[in-house]
Design a protein with these regions (language model features):
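Positively charged, low-complexity terminal tracts
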Residues: 1-93
Length: 93
């Protein structure tokens, strides 16, 4: 599955009138690496894969689950919503 994290639209207000588009891939890689306790070497491998990759990376369902879990535990609701949408709309290659 491809998850588009390099052009992630994050809505800054509840009415969704203000947003920012950011490259979140490396930011999420750092979160997994520094705060992904419990994922062990799989988390480390995913963080390295994300850091060195691009929007064309294929993620397994297990990797998507790690991304979702770490983001939900460590970031703001607006960021969580954006990442969950990217995962849900990911494409199978």
């Amino acid at each position: 599955m491809k998850i588009k994290l390099e052009q992630l639209e994050i809505f800054m207000t509840l009415d969704k009138k203000e947003s920012q588009v950011i490259n979140a891939r490396k930011q999420i890689a750092n979160l997994i690496y520094s705060q992904g306790a419990g994922f062990g070497l799989a988390g480390q491998a995913l963080a390295v894969k994300m850091w060195n990759g691009d929007d064309e990376i294929d993620y397994s369902s297990e990797e998507a689950s790690i991304i979702r879990s770490v983001v939900e535990k460590t970031t703001a609701p607006c960021f969580i919503e954006a990442v969950n949408k990217a995962i849900e709309t990911g494409t199978n290659a």
